[in-house]
């Protein structure tokens, strides 16, 4: 699956000082998506996309609008050829996935709630304290029956996002917080379907695919030493890019943070700060990102072809050549505006071949 986005007309009727630049971003995003789709098809990939309602308008919704169905990897997990979905994604993504094939709702064998903050938000008056939950979450007898059932239904984990996981042969690498690892002590047996794989948890800030990317057996692109590779990927060759991606766009990300909560919010389309934010992106950042920022959020088409949004990084190109991988340039101008790279905006649903143990 390749993501999709709102058409420029989605912002018809809004104040032009905000809607005009947003329309440009949407138009260029759709152009880049079409180019990406053609690249995928040229390599023999069957591509499906969420379908958009052409009559949908921003002003039709008086409340916060959901982001477009652009990043199908964020709330789905594909293991083998089984697609798990939390059901929290854009309705157009869920609908298209169900049309394509069976979508499986995750079933937890024990409650998994990964932080005290989330626990306090979802827990009822009859639930145990956070510390008692952490100590007893695998002991059903400790809980009232209805509390146990509620906790199972409200369970979630980073492994329910293919953006936080890498399925490499028979191993599933899951990026999660150090607090979650130390307090919850998650295990693959916590969820049906995951228990068939050797699950390895690694401390990670943000999505795994925005921090590092295994490009083929024995080779990894990485922004920094985000994990102890000698333990998780012993003997693999790692290309470190400590000054790329997020660190190169830090001033823009700071501006983006200031506008948190103003995304798709009715009444904010004429907000001067928001308008400045959008115009700053278009005026100062798009060309810079295209030309100088390398994003490890890449997509491997096969063992020898890697989709990249910046073909100009000499260090990366040398590393790819060393491992007999050819970069395939896919323009993706608004990656840091939408917060999704080439990997995030796709979701592998079916791959041929068999799973192997690459670490034996």
Residue ranges and their predicted role:
Residues 1-360:
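The feature marks the mature, well-folded catalytic cores of soluble enzymes
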């Amino acid at each position: 699956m390749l993501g999709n986005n709102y058409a420029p007309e989605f912002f018809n009727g809004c104040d032009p000082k905000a809607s005009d630049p947003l329309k440009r971003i949407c138009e260029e995003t759709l152009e880049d998506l079409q180019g990406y789709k053609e690249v995928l098809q040229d390599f023999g990939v069957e591509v499906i996309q969420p379908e958009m309602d052409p009559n949908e308008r921003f002003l039709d919704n008086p409340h916060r609008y959901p982001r477009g169905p652009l990043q199908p990897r964020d709330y789905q997990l594909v293991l083998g050829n089984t697609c798990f979905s939390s059901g929290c994604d854009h309705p157009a993504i869920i609908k298209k996935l169900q049309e394509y094939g069976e979508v499986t709702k995750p079933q937890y064998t024990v409650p998994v709630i990964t932080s005290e903050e989330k626990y306090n938000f979802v827990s009822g008056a009859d639930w145990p304290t956070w510390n008692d939950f952490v100590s007893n979450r695998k002991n059903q007898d400790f809980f009232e029956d209805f509390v146990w059932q509620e906790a199972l239904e409200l369970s979630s984990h980073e492994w329910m996002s293919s953006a936080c996981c890498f399925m490499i042969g028979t191993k599933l690498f899951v990026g999660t917080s150090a607090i979650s690892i130390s307090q919850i002590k998650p295990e693959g047996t916590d969820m049906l379907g995951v228990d068939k794989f050797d699950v390895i948890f690694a401390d990670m800030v943000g999505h795994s695919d925005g921090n590092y990317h295994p490009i083929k057996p024995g080779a990894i692109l990485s922004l920094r030493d985000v994990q102890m590779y000698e333990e998780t990927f012993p003997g693999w060759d790692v290309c470190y890019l400590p000054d790329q991606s997020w660190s190169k766009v830090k001033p823009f990300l700071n501006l983006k943070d200031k506008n948190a909560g103003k995304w798709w919010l009715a009444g904010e389309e004429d907000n001067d700060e928001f308008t400045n934010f959008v115009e700053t992106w278009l005026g100062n950042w798009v060309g810079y990102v295209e030309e100088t920022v390398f994003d490890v959020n890449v997509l491997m088409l096969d063992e020898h072809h890697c989709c990249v949004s910046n073909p100009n990084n000499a260090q990366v190109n040398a590393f790819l050549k060393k491992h007999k991988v050819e970069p395939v340039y896919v323009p993706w101008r608004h990656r840091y505006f939408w917060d999704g790279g080439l990997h995030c905006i796709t979701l592998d649903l079916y791959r041929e071949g068999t799973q192997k143990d690459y670490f034996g």
